[in-house]
Curated annotation (Swiss-Prot):
UniProt protein name: Chaperone protein DnaJ
UniProt organism field: Methanothermobacter thermautotrophicus (strain ATCC 29096 / DSM 1053 / JCM 10044 / NBRC 100330 / Delta H) (Methanobacterium thermoautotrophicum)
Domain notes: The J domain is necessary and sufficient to stimulate DnaK ATPase activity. Zinc center 1 plays an important role in the autonomous, DnaK-independent chaperone activity of DnaJ. Zinc center 2 is essential for interaction with DnaK and for DnaJ activity.
Sequence similarity: Belongs to the DnaJ family.
Cofactor(s) named in the record: Zn(2+)
Residues engaged in binding Zn(2+) 2: 165, 168, 191, 194
Encoding gene (name): dnaJ
GO CC annotations, alphabetized: cytoplasm
Binding site for Zn(2+) 1: 148, 151, 205, 208
Subcellular location: Cytoplasm
Amino acid sequence: MAKRDYYEILGVDRGADKKEIKKAYRRLARKYHPDVSDDPDAAEKFKEISEAYAVLSDDEKRARYDRFGHAGMDGFSQEDIFNNINFEDIFSGLGFDIGNIFDMFGFGGGRRHGPQRGADISYTLDISLEDAYNGLETDIRVPHTKKCPVCHGSRAEPGTGTRTCQTCGGSGQVRQVRNTILGQMMNITTCPDCQGEGTVVEKPCSNCNGKGVVRKTSTIHVKVPAGVETGSRLRVPGEGEMGLRGGEPGDLYVVIKVKPHSIFRREGANLYTEKPISFVQAALGDTVEVPTLDRPVKLRIPAGTQSGTTFRVKGHGMPHLKWNGYGNLYVKVKVVTPRKLSPRQKELLREFASISGDEIHEDKGFFDKVKDAIIH
Protein backbone atom coordinates (compact mmCIF):
# COMPACT_ATOMS: atom_id res chain seq x y z
CA MET A 1 0.00 0.00 0.00
CA ALA A 2 1.46 3.37 -1.08
CA LYS A 3 2.36 5.79 1.69
CA ARG A 4 0.27 8.95 1.93
CA ASP A 5 1.72 12.36 1.21
CA TYR A 6 3.13 13.95 4.39
CA TYR A 7 1.51 17.32 3.65
CA GLU A 8 -1.83 15.62 3.12
CA ILE A 9 -1.47 13.69 6.39
CA LEU A 10 -1.02 16.90 8.39
CA GLY A 11 -3.54 18.84 6.33
CA VAL A 12 -1.15 21.67 5.44
CA ASP A 13 -0.06 23.32 2.20
CA ARG A 14 3.34 22.51 0.70
CA GLY A 15 4.42 26.05 1.48
CA ALA A 16 3.44 25.87 5.17
CA ASP A 17 6.02 27.20 7.62
CA LYS A 18 7.29 25.33 10.70
CA LYS A 19 4.83 27.08 13.01
CA GLU A 20 1.86 25.95 10.91
CA ILE A 21 3.24 22.41 10.69
CA LYS A 22 3.74 22.18 14.46
CA LYS A 23 0.25 23.57 15.13
CA ALA A 24 -1.31 21.01 12.77
CA TYR A 25 0.65 18.18 14.39
CA ARG A 26 -0.36 19.14 17.95
CA ARG A 27 -4.00 19.32 16.88
CA LEU A 28 -3.90 15.85 15.33
CA ALA A 29 -1.87 14.47 18.26
CA ARG A 30 -4.62 15.52 20.66
CA LYS A 31 -7.04 13.54 18.51
CA TYR A 32 -5.06 10.36 17.83
CA HIS A 33 -2.67 9.84 20.76
CA PRO A 34 -3.53 6.40 22.22
CA ASP A 35 -3.66 7.91 25.73
CA VAL A 36 -6.78 9.90 24.80
CA SER A 37 -8.30 8.28 21.69
CA ASP A 38 -10.82 5.41 21.58
CA ASP A 39 -10.10 4.82 17.88
CA PRO A 40 -8.77 1.24 17.48
CA ASP A 41 -6.39 2.53 14.79
CA ALA A 42 -5.21 5.48 16.91
CA ALA A 43 -1.67 4.15 17.43
CA GLU A 44 -1.05 3.70 13.69
CA LYS A 45 -2.54 7.10 12.88
CA PHE A 46 -0.41 8.70 15.58
CA LYS A 47 2.71 7.10 14.12
CA GLU A 48 1.74 8.34 10.67
CA ILE A 49 1.24 11.97 11.70
CA SER A 50 4.39 11.87 13.85
CA GLU A 51 6.52 10.65 10.96
CA ALA A 52 5.06 13.34 8.71
CA TYR A 53 5.86 16.00 11.31
CA ALA A 54 9.39 14.69 11.91
CA VAL A 55 10.21 14.97 8.21
CA LEU A 56 8.49 18.27 7.44
CA SER A 57 9.83 20.04 10.53
CA ASP A 58 13.46 19.28 9.60
CA ASP A 59 14.85 21.50 6.83
CA GLU A 60 17.20 18.87 5.37
CA LYS A 61 14.70 16.00 5.46
CA ARG A 62 11.95 18.20 4.09
CA ALA A 63 14.14 19.28 1.18
CA ARG A 64 14.90 15.65 0.32
CA TYR A 65 11.21 14.75 0.58
CA ASP A 66 10.14 17.69 -1.59
CA ARG A 67 12.66 16.61 -4.26
CA PHE A 68 12.43 12.82 -4.19
CA GLY A 69 9.21 12.03 -2.31
CA HIS A 70 9.18 9.00 -0.05
CA ALA A 71 12.15 7.57 -1.96
CA GLY A 72 14.24 10.30 -0.39
CA MET A 73 13.57 8.80 3.02
CA ASP A 74 14.60 5.24 2.15
CA GLY A 75 18.04 5.64 3.68
CA PHE A 76 16.69 6.84 7.03
CA SER A 77 15.85 4.56 9.94
CA GLN A 78 13.07 5.43 12.37
CA GLU A 79 15.67 6.84 14.75
CA ASP A 80 17.20 8.93 11.94
CA ILE A 81 13.81 10.44 11.16
CA PHE A 82 13.01 11.31 14.77
CA ASN A 83 16.57 12.21 15.76
CA ASN A 84 16.04 15.96 16.23
CA ILE A 85 12.46 15.91 17.52
CA ASN A 86 11.91 17.27 21.05
CA PHE A 87 8.70 15.52 22.10
CA GLU A 88 8.87 17.11 25.56
CA ASP A 89 8.53 20.56 23.97
CA ILE A 90 5.88 19.54 21.47
CA PHE A 91 3.59 17.84 23.98
CA SER A 92 4.12 20.27 26.85
CA GLY A 93 0.77 20.76 28.58
CA LEU A 94 -1.03 17.96 26.74
CA GLY A 95 -0.63 15.41 29.54
CA PHE A 96 0.87 12.62 27.41
CA ASP A 97 3.35 10.05 28.75
CA ILE A 98 6.44 11.12 26.81
CA GLY A 99 8.37 7.96 27.65
CA ASN A 100 5.83 5.73 25.94
CA ILE A 101 6.19 7.64 22.68
CA PHE A 102 9.70 6.29 22.09
CA ASP A 103 8.51 2.74 22.74
CA MET A 104 5.68 3.30 20.26
CA PHE A 105 8.20 3.87 17.44
CA GLY A 106 10.40 0.96 18.49
CA PHE A 107 13.53 2.83 19.52
CA GLY A 108 12.99 3.19 23.24
CA GLY A 109 16.45 2.65 24.70
CA GLY A 110 18.74 4.76 22.58
CA ARG A 111 17.01 8.03 23.35
CA ARG A 112 16.78 7.75 27.15
CA HIS A 113 20.13 7.32 28.87
CA GLY A 114 19.19 9.44 31.88
CA PRO A 115 16.69 8.86 34.68
CA GLN A 116 13.17 8.04 33.57
CA ARG A 117 10.16 8.85 35.71
CA GLY A 118 7.86 5.95 36.48
CA ALA A 119 4.41 5.75 34.93
CA ASP A 120 1.33 7.00 36.76
CA ILE A 121 -1.29 4.39 37.67
CA SER A 122 -4.96 4.61 38.60
CA TYR A 123 -7.17 2.78 41.07
CA THR A 124 -10.99 2.95 41.08
CA LEU A 125 -12.51 3.31 44.55
CA ASP A 126 -16.24 2.60 44.95
CA ILE A 127 -17.85 4.56 47.78
CA SER A 128 -21.39 5.21 49.02
CA LEU A 129 -23.16 8.56 48.78
CA GLU A 130 -22.91 8.78 52.58
CA ASP A 131 -19.12 8.38 52.30
CA ALA A 132 -19.03 11.13 49.68
CA TYR A 133 -21.08 13.33 52.04
CA ASN A 134 -19.00 12.74 55.17
CA GLY A 135 -15.59 11.95 53.67
CA LEU A 136 -13.67 8.87 54.76
CA GLU A 137 -10.27 7.38 55.37
CA THR A 138 -9.62 3.89 54.07
CA ASP A 139 -6.84 1.50 53.09
CA ILE A 140 -6.55 0.22 49.53
CA ARG A 141 -4.30 -2.48 48.11
CA VAL A 142 -2.53 -1.43 44.93
CA PRO A 143 -0.25 -3.56 42.71
CA HIS A 144 2.75 -1.63 41.37
CA THR A 145 6.50 -1.92 40.85
CA LYS A 146 9.00 -1.13 43.58
CA LYS A 147 12.78 -1.02 43.71
CA CYS A 148 14.24 -4.52 44.00
CA PRO A 149 15.19 -5.05 47.68
CA VAL A 150 18.16 -7.24 46.69
CA CYS A 151 19.98 -5.20 44.03
CA HIS A 152 18.40 -1.85 45.08
CA GLY A 153 17.62 -1.03 41.47
CA SER A 154 21.10 -1.67 40.05
CA ARG A 155 19.85 -4.79 38.19
CA ALA A 156 23.11 -6.56 39.07
CA GLU A 157 23.59 -9.46 41.46
CA PRO A 158 25.08 -8.19 44.75
CA GLY A 159 28.87 -8.23 44.55
CA THR A 160 28.85 -7.63 40.80
CA GLY A 161 28.43 -4.50 38.73
CA THR A 162 28.08 -3.18 35.20
CA ARG A 163 30.53 -2.78 32.36
CA THR A 164 30.62 -0.77 29.16
CA CYS A 165 28.80 -2.46 26.31
CA GLN A 166 31.36 -3.80 23.87
CA THR A 167 28.98 -3.75 20.93
CA CYS A 168 28.31 0.00 20.94
CA GLY A 169 31.25 1.18 23.03
CA GLY A 170 28.90 2.79 25.55
CA SER A 171 27.03 5.01 23.09
CA GLY A 172 23.84 2.97 23.16
CA GLN A 173 23.65 3.15 19.38
CA VAL A 174 25.00 1.14 16.48
CA ARG A 175 25.91 3.00 13.28
CA GLN A 176 25.97 1.40 9.86
CA VAL A 177 26.76 2.99 6.51
CA ARG A 178 24.39 1.96 3.70
CA ASN A 179 24.75 2.57 -0.02
CA THR A 180 21.55 3.83 -1.64
CA ILE A 181 20.62 5.29 -4.99
CA LEU A 182 20.96 8.69 -3.34
CA GLY A 183 24.46 7.99 -2.03
CA GLN A 184 25.81 6.74 1.27
CA MET A 185 23.47 7.01 4.26
CA MET A 186 24.28 6.59 7.93
CA ASN A 187 21.84 4.21 9.61
CA ILE A 188 21.67 4.59 13.41
CA THR A 189 19.84 1.97 15.47
CA THR A 190 19.51 1.10 19.14
CA CYS A 191 22.20 -1.29 20.34
CA PRO A 192 20.61 -4.76 20.51
CA ASP A 193 22.83 -5.87 23.40
CA CYS A 194 22.44 -3.03 25.91
CA GLN A 195 19.06 -1.76 24.61
CA GLY A 196 20.48 1.74 24.38
CA GLU A 197 21.80 1.87 27.95
CA GLY A 198 25.49 1.89 27.00
CA THR A 199 26.25 -0.56 29.81
CA VAL A 200 25.40 -4.17 30.56
CA VAL A 201 25.26 -5.93 33.92
CA GLU A 202 27.92 -8.54 34.54
CA LYS A 203 25.46 -10.85 36.28
CA PRO A 204 21.72 -10.06 36.37
CA CYS A 205 20.08 -9.97 39.80
CA SER A 206 18.40 -13.31 40.43
CA ASN A 207 15.59 -11.73 42.47
CA CYS A 208 14.33 -9.33 39.78
CA ASN A 209 15.83 -11.04 36.70
CA GLY A 210 17.97 -7.99 36.03
CA LYS A 211 15.04 -5.56 35.82
CA GLY A 212 15.88 -3.57 38.94
CA VAL A 213 12.24 -3.56 40.01
CA VAL A 214 9.82 -6.12 41.42
CA ARG A 215 6.04 -6.17 41.38
CA LYS A 216 4.30 -6.09 44.73
CA THR A 217 0.98 -5.13 46.27
CA SER A 218 1.12 -2.29 48.77
CA THR A 219 -1.44 -1.16 51.34
CA ILE A 220 -1.94 2.58 50.94
CA HIS A 221 -3.92 4.82 53.29
CA VAL A 222 -6.21 7.20 51.41
CA LYS A 223 -8.08 10.23 52.72
CA VAL A 224 -11.22 10.96 50.70
CA PRO A 225 -12.50 14.51 51.29
CA ALA A 226 -16.19 15.28 51.70
CA GLY A 227 -17.89 16.38 48.49
CA VAL A 228 -16.17 14.09 45.99
CA GLU A 229 -18.21 12.78 43.09
CA THR A 230 -17.85 10.15 40.40
CA GLY A 231 -14.77 10.98 38.35
CA SER A 232 -12.98 12.89 41.12
CA ARG A 233 -9.26 12.01 41.17
CA LEU A 234 -7.12 11.96 44.30
CA ARG A 235 -3.36 12.12 43.73
CA VAL A 236 -1.07 10.05 45.95
CA PRO A 237 2.50 11.15 45.08
CA GLY A 238 5.16 8.51 44.55
CA GLU A 239 2.88 5.48 44.66
CA GLY A 240 2.85 4.78 40.91
CA GLU A 241 5.28 2.60 38.98
CA MET A 242 8.95 2.72 39.95
CA GLY A 243 11.21 4.98 37.90
CA LEU A 244 14.13 3.65 35.87
CA ARG A 245 17.80 4.53 36.21
CA GLY A 246 17.19 6.50 39.38
CA GLY A 247 14.12 8.29 38.06
CA GLU A 248 11.32 9.36 40.38
CA PRO A 249 8.37 7.00 40.82
CA GLY A 250 5.09 7.91 39.18
CA ASP A 251 1.96 8.89 41.08
CA LEU A 252 -1.14 6.95 42.03
CA TYR A 253 -4.47 8.47 41.06
CA VAL A 254 -7.47 7.21 43.03
CA VAL A 255 -10.54 7.62 40.81
CA ILE A 256 -13.79 7.93 42.77
CA LYS A 257 -16.97 6.12 41.75
CA VAL A 258 -20.03 6.95 43.87
CA LYS A 259 -22.58 4.14 43.95
CA PRO A 260 -26.27 4.91 43.16
CA HIS A 261 -28.46 5.68 46.19
CA SER A 262 -31.87 4.22 46.93
CA ILE A 263 -33.40 7.55 48.02
CA PHE A 264 -31.38 10.41 46.58
CA ARG A 265 -30.33 11.41 43.08
CA ARG A 266 -27.31 13.69 42.83
CA GLU A 267 -26.53 16.50 40.42
CA GLY A 268 -23.34 18.28 41.40
CA ALA A 269 -23.79 19.49 44.97
CA ASN A 270 -27.59 19.23 44.87
CA LEU A 271 -29.68 16.24 45.93
CA TYR A 272 -33.13 15.26 44.68
CA THR A 273 -35.73 13.01 46.31
CA GLU A 274 -39.48 12.35 46.35
CA LYS A 275 -41.90 12.50 49.29
CA PRO A 276 -45.33 10.82 49.15
CA ILE A 277 -48.16 12.75 50.85
CA SER A 278 -51.89 12.13 51.15
CA PHE A 279 -54.46 14.17 49.26
CA VAL A 280 -55.68 15.51 52.61
CA GLN A 281 -52.17 16.79 53.42
CA ALA A 282 -51.96 18.32 49.96
CA ALA A 283 -55.36 20.00 50.31
CA LEU A 284 -55.15 21.21 53.91
CA GLY A 285 -51.39 21.62 54.25
CA ASP A 286 -49.13 19.90 56.77
CA THR A 287 -45.60 19.65 58.13
CA VAL A 288 -43.84 16.46 57.10
CA GLU A 289 -40.46 14.92 57.85
CA VAL A 290 -38.04 14.35 54.98
CA PRO A 291 -34.74 12.45 55.09
CA THR A 292 -31.34 14.01 54.43
CA LEU A 293 -27.86 12.52 54.53
CA ASP A 294 -27.35 14.19 57.90
CA ARG A 295 -30.63 14.02 59.84
CA PRO A 296 -34.39 14.21 59.15
CA VAL A 297 -35.71 17.76 58.68
CA LYS A 298 -39.19 19.29 58.75
CA LEU A 299 -40.79 20.50 55.52
CA ARG A 300 -43.89 22.70 55.45
CA ILE A 301 -46.46 21.66 52.83
CA PRO A 302 -48.75 24.63 52.02
CA ALA A 303 -52.48 24.06 51.61
CA GLY A 304 -53.45 23.36 48.02
CA THR A 305 -50.14 21.81 47.03
CA GLN A 306 -50.32 19.98 43.70
CA SER A 307 -48.68 16.62 43.02
CA GLY A 308 -45.28 17.13 41.41
CA THR A 309 -44.53 20.37 43.23
CA THR A 310 -40.84 20.64 44.16
CA PHE A 311 -39.65 22.31 47.35
CA ARG A 312 -36.12 23.48 48.10
CA VAL A 313 -34.52 22.66 51.43
CA LYS A 314 -31.56 25.04 51.50
CA GLY A 315 -28.16 23.76 52.62
CA HIS A 316 -29.07 20.09 52.91
CA GLY A 317 -27.38 18.87 49.72
CA MET A 318 -23.79 17.70 49.28
CA PRO A 319 -20.81 19.64 50.64
CA HIS A 320 -18.90 21.63 48.04
CA LEU A 321 -15.52 20.06 47.35
CA LYS A 322 -13.58 23.24 46.58
CA TRP A 323 -15.23 25.77 48.87
CA ASN A 324 -17.25 25.95 52.09
CA GLY A 325 -20.97 25.37 52.15
CA TYR A 326 -23.49 22.85 50.90
CA GLY A 327 -25.78 22.43 47.96
CA ASN A 328 -29.55 22.15 48.31
CA LEU A 329 -32.02 19.31 48.72
CA TYR A 330 -34.98 19.37 46.34
CA VAL A 331 -38.07 17.46 47.47
CA LYS A 332 -40.73 16.58 44.91
CA VAL A 333 -44.06 15.74 46.56
CA LYS A 334 -46.21 13.01 45.14
CA VAL A 335 -49.89 13.00 46.13
CA VAL A 336 -50.98 9.41 46.75
CA THR A 337 -54.60 8.45 46.03
CA PRO A 338 -55.96 5.88 48.53
CA ARG A 339 -56.87 2.53 46.99
CA LYS A 340 -59.45 1.54 49.62
CA LEU A 341 -62.00 3.77 51.36
CA SER A 342 -64.42 3.01 54.18
CA PRO A 343 -68.14 3.74 53.65
CA ARG A 344 -67.84 6.80 55.90
CA GLN A 345 -64.87 8.12 53.92
CA LYS A 346 -66.79 7.66 50.69
CA GLU A 347 -69.78 9.47 52.18
CA LEU A 348 -67.65 12.44 53.21
CA LEU A 349 -66.00 12.60 49.80
CA ARG A 350 -69.40 12.55 48.07
CA GLU A 351 -70.51 15.38 50.32
CA PHE A 352 -67.35 17.30 49.49
CA ALA A 353 -67.95 16.74 45.78
CA SER A 354 -71.53 17.98 46.12
CA ILE A 355 -70.44 21.13 47.92
CA SER A 356 -67.77 21.71 45.30
CA GLY A 357 -70.25 21.28 42.48
CA ASP A 358 -68.48 18.24 41.10
CA GLU A 359 -70.59 15.59 39.40
CA ILE A 360 -69.23 12.14 40.26
CA HIS A 361 -69.93 9.05 38.15
CA GLU A 362 -68.78 6.20 40.34
CA ASP A 363 -67.97 2.76 39.01
CA LYS A 364 -70.58 0.25 40.18
CA GLY A 365 -69.66 -3.01 41.76
CA PHE A 366 -70.78 -6.44 40.45
CA PHE A 367 -73.77 -6.80 42.81
CA ASP A 368 -74.97 -3.24 42.12
CA LYS A 369 -75.00 -4.06 38.41
CA VAL A 370 -77.02 -7.29 39.05
CA LYS A 371 -79.49 -5.34 41.17
CA ASP A 372 -80.01 -2.73 38.44
CA ALA A 373 -80.57 -5.49 35.86
CA ILE A 374 -83.32 -7.12 37.99
CA ILE A 375 -85.09 -3.85 38.71
CA HIS A 376 -85.04 -2.76 35.11
